[in-house]
Amino acid sequence: VNHTIFIIGTRPEITKIAPIANNLNSKILFTGQHFSKNMSNGFFDLIKNREIINLNLKRFKNFDNNIRFIANQLEIKLKKLNANKIIVQGDTNTTLVGAIATKTLNKKLYFIESGMRSFDISQIEEYNRLITSHLADINFCNHITNKENLLNEGVSKSKILVTGSTVYSAVNLVDSSIESIGEKKYILLTLHRPENVDKKEKLLNLLKTINKLNYRVIFPVHPRTKANLDKYDIQKLENIKFLKPKNYKDFIELIKYSKFIISDSGGVQEEAAIYRKPLLIPRQYTERPEMLNKFNILVKNNKELLMQSKNILNGNSCLEKPLLVTPLLYGKMKPIENIINGINNK
């Protein structure tokens, strides 16, 4: 039997492919790039009745420097599985490795969430996106701006499909089981990008700035960030509550009932928008510029972060009005149907 295989390796990839995998005869190949138990365990519950093959490649401590080797491991597995259609998602190292393995075997590659560009090539995610979209046979885009990016880079129109985003469907998988508790008085914080967490000074100043708001902050800590907090001996700050990573339902609940969110994550931009929560992005660039100043604000330094946070807390943020009236950008297009039709028919 020829199989359709998803290659994934991180929590956001699990959540974003779950609604598709649940409606498509497929298997899941998990590289284990997110390697701590509580990083992936509660997330696999989102996938129903599909075989999940865990390659457990976490034992290669330095995943990033073993791309060729890991691609080779994937090739061996894909051959055994007789896979003919392979799907990757997002912008992680697993995305790139999956794409390389697929094309080495000359199999058909489908790329979900293609065409996003921050135009900041110093970020590993940007070149993962760039290379994967040029290797893909079919690029599924969340938004028309993503399609335009690909056309500008010379990707053939016949290889591009604007489908909408699966995040809306992923949130729907858990929303109904979230208890109704109403908005709580806390800011939700997530940080994982190297530019924010890999340098002691940067990480410490960012946390100190957020602590200065004198407002309760809930901070589920990503393993990469946790390792650096330990390494730099950054102790708890009085207003910031450090938590272990949450499963998807609990994390979405934290978004739903937060006052506002500070996050450098791409997926959180979409999740926050669904609940119309103001979001501040502590980064220099974003790969979702179409959301800026409607659903979120890019804060390029700590001074801006402090100012915009105070504006939200004082009820005079420039996001107040747009958040009420802007239609959701990616969710209403039936992305699951569009992507499944694309996989079956192209």
What are these regions (language model features)?
Residues V1-Y215, T225-K346:
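Nucleotide-activated sugar donor-binding and catalytic core shared by glycosyltransferases
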